[in-house]
Curated annotation (Swiss-Prot):
Gene Ontology terms describing biological process: meiotic cell cycle
Start-end of Low complexity biased regions: 156-165
Family per similarity comment: Belongs to the MISS family.
Biased composition annotated in UniProt, kind: Polar residues: 176-189
Biased composition (Basic residues): 202-213
Protein name (Swiss-Prot/TrEMBL): MAPK-interacting and spindle-stabilizing protein
Entry keyword annotation includes Cytoplasm: yes
Main localization (coarse): cytoplasm
Length: 263
């Protein structure tokens, strides 16, 4: 397998070449197998497995050369094969004796136009859509069929402007009441306006008078009056509880006098 190289001739006086006693490479150890022993004999070349297979029978008498024509379905050749090698390509379709049907036309019936073609004539932008005709009526005030409070025609239907005098107690569909009489009622419309509660007239609250500032002199005077009142009734004024009772009585009497004087 490798060419044989003869050893170099030794010159006289030159040292002898170093020759190892054992093999040049150590023997492998482990699970790996040792080197194969070469058997003496003639060496043969390696035979490749890429050889042509024998021709197989094709159905419908189809040609075996993939380079040749395969009918209306085109050629399925995969390379420059020589005739007679056998077209065993897996993608070669089987041929049928009848011809393939014609593909149907589009639904519209017009022939297909390639996308690269341009129709003859100068190109112009598309025309604008026509403006719709004014067939709808103009919006306006339409009377409501289910209006429970129709406005009567005339100047009275207009709403009062700002600053104008108008009656606030008018009710739609009824007669306006007399605003001069506060106790008048709307008998015609079935509605009544009560201005009295529990048959008692409403009174205005009187403004409270500012209370007088209490001084120590007022406290001494009130205490002296309470002590005199307790002595007149025979109570012991030295008792704090009794003195407090007399003082509360004196305050109650003074409040009664003030209320009677204000009336």
């Amino acid at each position: 397998m490798y060419p044989f190289i003869p050893p170099a001739r030794l010159l006289p006086g030159s040292p002898a070449p170093f020759l190892p006693s054992g093999p040049s490479c150590p023997q492998p150890s482990g699970p790996y197998p040792g080197p194969a022993v070469r058997v003496p004999g003639p060496t043969r070349s390696y035979v490749s497995t890429n050889v042509p297979f024998p021709e197989l029978p094709r159905p419908n008498s189809a040609p075996t050369d993939p380079v040749g024509p395969l009918g209306t379905q085109g050629s399925m050749s995969s390379g420059p094969w020589a005739p007679g090698m056998g077209g065993q390509h897996p993608n070669v379709p089987y041929l049928f004796p009848e011809s393939s049907p014609t593909p149907p036309l589009p639904v519209s019936g017009a022939p297909p136009v390639a996308w690269v073609t341009v129709p003859p004539g100068a190109w112009e932008p598309p025309a604008q859509y026509p403006t719709p005709e004014a067939s709808y009526p103009s919006p306006g005030l339409q009377p409501s069929p289910n209006n429970p409070y129709p406005l009567p025609p005339g100047p009275s239907a207009a709403s009062p402007g700002p600053g104008s005098l108008h009656r606030m107690n008018e009710i739609p569909g009824g007669s306006p009441s007399d605003s001069s009489n506060p106790e008048s009622t709307l008998e015609s419309t079935g509605q009544k306006k009560h201005l009295k509660l529990d048959n008692k007239s409403i009174k205005r609250r009187r403004s409270k008078k500012k209370s007088k500032r209490v001084t120590w002199g007022d406290i001494k005077t009130l205490t002296h009056k309470a002590e005199s009142l307790g002595k007149q009734q025979g109570h012991n004024t030295t008792d704090p509880k009794m003195m407090l009772l007399c003082l509360m009585t004196m305050l109650h009497v003074n409040s009664q006098h003030e209320s009677e004087g204000s009336k």
